A protein has these predicted regions:
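N-terminal subdomain of nucleotide-sugar transferases
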Residues: 1-62, 172, 230-238, 242, ...
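Acceptor-binding helix/loop patch of EC 2.4 sugar-transfer enzymes
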Residues: 8, 13, 68-80, 99, ...
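Donor nucleotide-sugar binding/catalytic pocket of nucleotide-sugar-dependent glycosyltransferases
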Residues: 40, 129, 137, 152-204
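Membrane-proximal helix-turn-helix segments that form the acceptor-binding/catalytic region
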Residues: 88-95, 112-115, 119-123, 132, ...
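Conserved donor-binding/catalytic core segment of Leloir-type glycosyltransferases
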Residues: 207-226, 232-238
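Nucleotide-activated donor-binding/catalytic signature segment of Leloir-type glycosyltransferases, i.e.
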Residues: 213, 244-273
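Nucleotide-sugar-dependent
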Residues: 226, 265-272, 277-299, 306-316
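A charged, aromatic-enriched C-terminal amphipathic alpha-helix characteristic of glycosyltransferases
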Residues: 329, 342-371
């Protein structure tokens, strides 16, 4: 079977980070004996810079770079224009090819590229899987400027209708968490967590772990979805706490026990996580995120997990007794959650990672589902 996978956002392994969802998915299709073309943007969403093109054939898959207009802000008209230009470029490149796919897997977002996937599926007689990685346009409503909040729902209604049209038109709909099942309106929705590679678990066996202390770490995007102010406030109020922050974006603190490392390559991030004790997931209370990428990194490192997310994330933390939850935006609640982690060893998170987040099993099962006759 010839498979096309389309996603403009995930980092590529050649950019220094760990393998992310769609690369891991592509490898699973290759393991099952399928031919894979991986379509992605030539502009890095996380780094906001032009990408260096990897080899056109990489690890057995073809990598096709789609020309994309740059943008600097995650919430901006320039980004919307960039997404539309990406969708047009992908349409043109796909139609110029001599080969035809049997299956197209398209991430959602973006809405415009997912819509192209539906159209290409009809034109090329291919089945189409829409894979929901984030809630669009619902996330836009949450991030709308305060003056626009009262009318954001009405302004975004056309995008919401288009998203629902895409979900109905797809042959299959999959996603990264159970929460998105209701969003799609599909009873046949298939959930596949983002996951993380199992070999990463063993990396930490050879590194020094934090010794039952109270050294916190946050890794990931430093955008508006995350509430680091509350974490810093809790650290300032308790001299036994330290915080390491690693990620892309702007961050500063006048507290000497708060350290900012910037964006770290995979090995340096692994080493930092191994030195810390507790991974923090400080999501705002109106977030649509089910389980963020950082939870997989923390679990693979054996960190105790403190999260303000409810739903699936809180349920898994409770099931494996590997951390605690706190009230979003409340520093005293976060401090209490940190204290509640005192008697928890790293094996609890590692067990959760082995049972729930093993990427090999997740994506082999995914391939089995979407290729069923």
């Amino acid at each position: 079977m010839t498979v096309w996978i389309q996603n403009p956002f995930d980092s590529l392994p050649s950019e220094g980070g760990r393998k992310q969802r769609y690369w891991l998915m592509a490898e699973a299709f290759l393991r099952a004996g399928h031919r894979v073309t991986y379509w992605t943007s030539d502009f890095s969403h996380s780094g906001k810079r032009r990408r260096e093109a990897p080899p056109s054939v990489h690890d057995g898959m073809e990598v096709a770079m789609v020309p994309t207009a740059p943008y600097s802000g995650n919430v901006s008209m320039r980004r919307i224009a960039s997404h539309r230009a990406y969708a047009r470029s992908w349409t043109r490149m796909a139609c110029e090819r001599g080969d035809r796919p049997d299956l197209i897997v398209s991430s959602m977002p973006t809405i415009s590229a997912a819509s192209v996937a539906i159209s290409l599926g009809r034109r090329l007689s291919a089945r189409v899987v829409i894979d929901v990685q984030d809630a669009w346009p619902e996330t836009f409503e949450r991030l709308a400027p305060n003056p626009l909040r009262p009318i954001a729902g009405a302004l975004l209604a056309p995008l919401r209708r288009e998203a629902q049209r895409i979900y109905r038109a797809a042959d299959m709909v999959t996603g990264v968490c159970d929460r998105y099942r209701d969003l799609t309106g599909r009873d046949d929705y298939f959930r596949a967590y983002l996951g993380i590679e199992a070999p990463r678990h063993r990396f930490f066996e050879d590194l020094r772990y934090g010794t039952g202390g109270r050294r916190l770490v946050y890794s990931g995007n430093l955008g508006r979805s995350y509430d680091l102010d509350t974490v810093v406030k809790a650290v300032k109020a308790d001299e036994s706490l330290e915080l390491d922050v690693a990620g892309f974006g702007e961050f500063s603190s006048d507290c000497p026990r708060v350290r900012f490392h910037g964006m770290l390559p995979a090995e340096r991030l692994q080493a930092l996580l191994a030195e810390c004790d507790i991974g923090v997931i400080p999501m705002r209370d109106d977030s649509w995120v089910g389980i963020p990428n950082k939870m997989f990194d923390y679990a693979a490192a054996g960190l105790r997990i403190v999260t303000s997310l409810g739903g699936e994330a809180a349920g898994l933390v409770a099931k494996y007794r590997c951390g605690a939850t706190y009230r979003p935006g409340v520093a005293t609640s976060l401090a209490a959650a940190v204290s509640a982690c005192g008697g928890i060893g790293r094996d609890a998170s590692l067990e959760m990672c082995r049972r729930e987040f093993d990427a090999i099993k997740i994506y082999d099962d995914y391939v089995g589902f979407v290729t069923m006759p």
